[in-house]
UniProtKB/Swiss-Prot annotation:
Subunit relationships: Part of a tripartite efflux system composed of MdtA, MdtB and MdtC. MdtC forms a heteromultimer with MdtB.
UniProt record similarity statement: Belongs to the resistance-nodulation-cell division (RND) (TC 2.A.6) family. MdtC subfamily.
UniProt cross-references to NCBIfam families, sorted A to Z: PRK10614.1, RND_permease_2
Name recorded for this polypeptide: Multidrug resistance protein MdtC
Its membrane topology: Multi-pass membrane protein
Amino acid sequence: MRFFALFIYRPVATILIAAAITLCGILGFRLLPVAPLPQVDFPVIMVSASLPGASPETMASSVATPLERSLGRIAGVNEMTSSSSLGSTRIILEFNFDRDINGAARDVQAAINAAQSLLPGGMPSRPTYRKANPSDAPIMILTLTSESWSQGKLYDFASTQLAQTIAQIDGVGDIDVGGSSLPAVRVGLNPQALFNQGVSLDEVREAIDSANVRRPQGAIEDSVHRWQIQTNDELKTAAEYQPLIIHYNNGAAVRLGDVASVTDSVQDVRNAGMTNAKPAILLMIRKLPEANIIQTVDGIRAKLPELRAMIPAAIDLQIAQDRSPTIRASLQEVEETLAISVALVILVVFLFLRSGRATLIPAVAVPVSLIGTFAAMYLCGFSLNNLSLMALTIATGFVVDDAIVVLENIARHLEAGMKPLQAALQGTREVGFTVISMSLSLVAVFLPLLLMGGLPGRLLREFAVTLSVAIGISLVVSLTLTPMMCGWMLKSSKPRTQPRKRGVGRLLVALQQGYGTSLKWVLNHTRLVGVVFLGTVALNIWLYIAIPKTFFPEQDTGVLMGGIQADQSISFQAMRGKLQDFMKIIRDDPAVNNVTGFTGGSRVNSGMMFITLKPRGERKETAQQIIDRLRVKLAKEPGARLFLMAVQDIRVGGRQANASYQYTLLSDSLAALREWEPKIRKALSALPQLADVNSDQQDNGAEMNLIYDRDTMSRLGIDVQAANSLLNNAFGQRQISTIYQPMNQYKVVMEVDPRYSQDISALEKMFVINRDGKAIPLSYFAQWRPANAPLSVNHQGLSAASTIAFNLPTGTSLSQATEAINRTMTQLGVPSTVRGSFSGTAQVFQQTMNSQLILIVAAIATVYIVLGILYESYVHPLTILSTLPSAGVGALLALELFNAPFSLIALIGIMLLIGIVKKNAIMMVDFALEAQRSGGLTPAQAIFQACLLRFRPIMMTTLAALFGALPLVLSGGDGSELRQPLGITIVGGLVMSQLLTLYTTPVVYLFFDRLRLRFSRKNSKPVVEI
């Protein structure tokens, strides 16, 4: 009593406290970063190693395996995957959430150092690592085009100057430069000319390497001067290499230009990049795992004027893709939804109270509670994102509830003629415990979420804390500011036997009278209501089992990503043509704004594309509808497939799969994996629940197998090393020397001129100089035949792995797809030597599914414990919790009606309903217990009177929560796919709960009261008179 009086009778202090909360909130709002979702990126480090010319199997066994054994000893590694292709190996390490990325990077470097002695010689550089996830979509793509500069020169400028400058920006984690490679001097050998001159390829390589050296020459000095010695020991351009003498034939000098074409070119000619049909160099920028995407993009954009000022006029620098506009638009939509929710809630209050002054009180309480929450969000290190702003939107209906309960009870005393200050004090005292019970039990719902681990726990933590803080501030405001404003702003009215009612008031009176009549009938037919109650419990179980489920709603971020997978024997020239064809098909779609893509490198038959769609306001279709439309056109392209998927704000795992979801096959036997993977992939491709089924197992690449006749080689004086060196020199794009320039280092690359290596006959032109100096053709001691060979070898842990990726057809949920895959694996009878499991997002979905029911039960148990403590009763909490089944039925039916799968967002809605709908029962039970204690009423009379007396605040609080969530259901535009499931769940649950709990709660109350009396009689002892 004294606590409430302290704030009611000291209005200045109360107002200043509320103002302080508001000012702190405004300051916190201005300092909060902006993001699409809470920070849920796993710490990921990518290790790269190269050995030019080595086959995928050689890279896997000699490079990947030693590194994996060393890296696998690092603490906190969630998953380790590797992919080895022609000349390169990439290992992805995904760490636990609580692992510091910088500490992990130090451990990775130590592991690389430990494995160094086990790696093969001839590697051009030590393995390197980068703190970035290559499977993440770039946050920004910059393109460089030029009419006069070559692609190699553009690539050099981009990688040497632009990438270095951008990498220094806070938040930038990794920059992939694609579309070409660094400049190089390329030596294209003529095998016939070499044979005629008797010059071996090793001799050419050694002559070039010896002619281009960089060694210190020292200095000369006398008593006065010092001279640094400098020589022309370096050759830097193709023109300087052409006259180089590599051999003497009968006294005549054989120069490099006589036996080879020497050109200024690039290190790897098998690379191509394009933007909107123009050749381009792409800078694909990814953020650090812990970085904020908006702040990072803003930092890059702020640097762009400086970057444009430093580039030559012949280069055009453009932004081809930027993730931030759709993120900002989505957050703006949420902010508008929040404003609409606040307005609707205030309108509900006004319609019920029909007083401007009375409406002003919750109109002040709501913004103070919401704005004050921003201060706590800042202190907790949160961000303004879709989930935290959705929490505030939902909180609108919650925070007004406390104010409504207090305000309505005070208004009831004022209508009875009590003086304002007395009414404020008395009304607050009566409902103070009720308000505290409602708020604490609501906060209790979120305690299990705060203890939840993994990605779902990280994702929901900000939502739970934000909502809990808003409820806590609302509780303080409703017990301090609200009664103070009621006492000083509202006026008492003369009691009337039949007060005048207009509009909504008349409707409310009619509803209350009708409710009273129907409630009397219900209390006389309790068994029927009990059957209905048990029916809702059973229906909950059935609906939860039957409803389609997914991990997270499919987002439309306005960006698509596509992976190209062509025939495994395709040439680079043909692959570049496929890239152009696919880009034309996509560019012609009316919903597409920009297309960039690249191909080449170690995997000639693959490529990547990034598509920026027009803003949502300029297109009618969703991203998924656009993909469905393009899929039909793209399927007509022979010899290659392009798999499109919408870029999501959440992507789990480090695999660069060509679809959104993955199923990984593991085996200790590579042969067993290669036997069963095609069978499993074929079976999964036939499932209607899956689309775009593809695999990263590529073991049908064209290979030319050379079989050495070792006896003949020994007789001819040739060793295997010389033969292998011949092949590497001829066909491996061998980097044989380094050219040092002020800004970078470039390579001299040697191979047979492409004019002489167009077919298998090129092998017939190869020869080796034996120990006697004679030229021995390769065909003398080797035979060759075509065969199939893998284009890549993949590992997970230390096991051979193959990942089957898939998308979902429109109208199919992830649960339906996973069930179909598990069923198919069982039907196929896959042996125990091949193990299958979901990975990436599908794996997290499986883990979340296993914990959903536990989470809901834990939330209900927590609420029960809190209510039991508050009421000092085992029974009354059960009465209050009896409101939950009807809410669950309403939520699940609403999701079915809107064809929305049960996702993590819908789970949040269910958790919220646990907190919302019990408020009705709390208000009923509190007044019924008070009526029994102080009024001497029977349980039936008490609960009947409580239901009628609390009918108006129950309607007000329910409608406030309903109208607070309604804008989420009706919202469109960017990010609506996240907001709508939450709104649908809450609105559906509230409507069904309101219809049923007004009748089931009093029946359950009476049932438990009779049960209590029955047990009390059994346990009572007879009184013995003395």
